[in-house]
Amino acid sequence: MITIRIGTRPSRLAVRQAEIVASAIRHAGYEVEIVKYRSEGDSDLKSPLYSIGKTGVFVERLNSLILSGDIDAAVHSAKDIPYEIDRRLRISAVMPRGRFEDALVSENPLSKLPPGSVIGTSSLRRRYQILYQRKDVKVSNIRGNVDTRIEKMRSEGMAGIVMALAAIDRLELNLRYWPFDPEKFVPAPNQGIIAVVSEDGSKASEVLSSINDADTYDDMMAERSITQGLKLGCSTPVGILSRHTGKGMRILAQFFAMDGSDMMMFDQHVDGLDDVDGIVSYIRENLPEEYGYKL
């Protein structure tokens, strides 16, 4: 029987996501081995993610191990995968999307926090979304895996931290949290999606294609197409969300000025993936130049 070796980062969330993929592969009738590797981004826990200046800092190491033959596939959070990867590789499968919303892990919702409260996040998008709603709170950089961030929140006296609901669900965390309205806090492109990369044309790619969730894959590709079409980096303060409506796809795109001074929301409906290019053109034509994007 074929054994598929899947690589993952060693964090609890990354391993849990690999286990979800492994379960799907086993259900399809194949053996699985989970292999853990550490990345550069796991070592630098002080710099904000948006300041590291390296797209896919958690992804490149694992993907290189596919090409070297050390593993057959790599499990990633889809939002971490650069929009251009080695042409020998492909995203062969995605799991059904988890809850894509962000949430404030806190004793109180954002609207009830006292002025001057400190909220932790390393995401520029989340920073600006919070400050757009509450200019009287403070946002502090916080890095590390889920457990590290929760511990830092408590030890440093923060009022809360921002986390993806999918992470809270997958780790079955017993936390008090307040989901953000995705109409106002549009999540990062591909948030909540587990993706599996393998070598194009390989046996692993064939196996993985059999466990792919088609609707989630289409939403992922719509969000990635917009981001790639506009040449947006992973650190830009932008949220993009695609959702199937039964009559096509509804796409929300939230853009903040690079300095956080203003925000613009795009809300578009398309029949399918082939129409996404029209959204790219519309955003390019209507996003103010003073926002600082080079589209």
From Swiss-Prot:
Pfam families with a match to the protein in the record: Porphobil_deam (PF01379)
Cofactor: dipyrromethane
Biological process terms in GO annotation: protoporphyrinogen IX biosynthetic process
Cofactor: binding details: Binds 1 dipyrromethane group covalently.
Protein name: Probable porphobilinogen deaminase
Source lineage: Archaea, Methanobacteriati, Thermoplasmatota, Thermoplasmata, Thermoplasmatales
Modified residues (S-(dipyrrolylmethanemethyl)cysteine): C234
Note: The porphobilinogen subunits are added to the dipyrromethane group.
Catalytic activity line of the entry: 4 porphobilinogen + H2O = hydroxymethylbilane + 4 NH4(+)
GO CC, any one term: cytoplasm
